[in-house]
Amino acid sequence: MRMNKQIVVTDWIKEKPKLGSFLKLTLSSDERRILRGKRLTDCDQEIILQLPREGKLNDGDILSTNKSNFYVEIVAKKENLIEISSNSKIELIKTAYHLGNRHVELEIEEGILLTKSDYVIKNMLLNFKVNIKNTKKKFFPERGAHSHE
């Protein structure tokens, strides 16, 4: 569904409306931090984000537009990641510590760390007593202590 008129995204909606047209906007974890500027939806419709500067776009967010009954749904993009696991909790904690010292973004799950696929990081991980494997999934890194999101 392409519209010729410019679509401007202006705010978050708390509940998904039962009626209306929806465009899907699939974004990586990095792209979900940028709240202003032009984007292309999944159906190649150009939209302009003009959201309040604070916050972050999350998977499943519904955004209002300057068109009545027209909405944008945020979808987290599947990304190439490294999945890190270990039978030893202490080894996993040490690995998280060293990755944190390198300011590497991490998603922390029960018994698993996830980070973006990176050749240098992958080689560094080979020196730790952890299991590593490539995976592709949605990435939700922890927000840092000094984050302004």
Swiss-Prot record:
GO terms for biological process: protein folding; protein-containing complex assembly; urea metabolic process. It comes from the Bacteria. The keyword Secreted does not apply. The keyword Chaperone applies. Its main location: cytoplasm. One of its GO terms (cellular component) is cytoplasm. InterPro entries: UreE, UreE_C_dom, UreE_N, UreE_N_sf. One of its GO terms (molecular function) is nickel cation binding. It is found in: Cytoplasm. Pfam families: UreE_C. CDD domains: UreE (cd00571). Keywords: Chaperone, Cytoplasm, Nickel, Nickel insertion. Involved in urease metallocenter assembly. Binds nickel. Probably functions as a nickel donor during metallocenter assembly. Belongs to the UreE family. This is Urease accessory protein UreE.
